[in-house]
Amino acid sequence: MKVVAFERSLQGTGASRRLRNSGKTPGIVYGAGAETQLVELDHNALWHALKKEVFHSSILDLEVAGKSQQVLLRDVQYHPFRQLVLHVDFQRVDAKKKLHTKVPLHFMNQESNPAVKLSSAVISHVINEIEIECLPSALPEFLEVDLATIEAGHSVHAKDIKLPAGVSLVAHVEAENPVVAAATIPAGAIAEGDAAAAGEGETPAA
């Protein structure tokens, strides 16, 4: 995904305020052994880009002054109550070094799960993104979590996710192996099932 930014020379609270008033958003580009670069982006274009999942989880081609560099979006600061992006941070990517980043999880086959269809189970998505490490060339836009066979009372953990070649969970996620999704039967559904079973077991009065 291509992103266009422009060099900026002024920094500080006053300069950033004037920039925002003119429809621009200040940002920085850092990392990969190069100097930190001050940039500005068109606010409306940035606002719409931030609505796309791919903008948050993919390597971006950032063009500044006619030169392109590969970056990851690392931080976004929003105004607390206005639809306004205050600042963005981009980190340069080194093609030869593994990067640590979070990618979104896409949950698949939930509607066709037998526990959902036959037992009224509810599948909760406990986390919606997970931290991985890989070379930039292997970075996936998202990871799929297959919920087709999860049974009521059971969970899917981080280590159950099928990872593409060259991708691994970061060390602390590997060690903790957190729950990603869990299937439970609501108390109301259990009570209804017990009541139905009790009704079936009653002997009709003579």
Swiss-Prot record:
Disulfide bonds: none
Keyword ATP-binding: no
Primary role: This is one of the proteins that binds to the 5S RNA in the ribosome where it forms part of the central protuberance.
GO biological process terms on file: translation
UniProt keyword list: Ribonucleoprotein, Ribosomal protein, RNA-binding, rRNA-binding
NCBIfam families, A to Z: bL25_bact_ctc, PRK05618.1-2, PRK05618.1-5, PRK05943.1
Keyword RNA-binding: yes
SUPFAM superfamilies named in the record: Ribosomal protein L25-like
Cleaved signal peptide residues: none
Full protein name: Large ribosomal subunit protein bL25
Family of this protein: Belongs to the bacterial ribosomal protein bL25 family. CTC subfamily.
Annotated organism of origin: Paraburkholderia phytofirmans (strain DSM 17436 / LMG 22146 / PsJN)
Residue runs in coiled coils: none
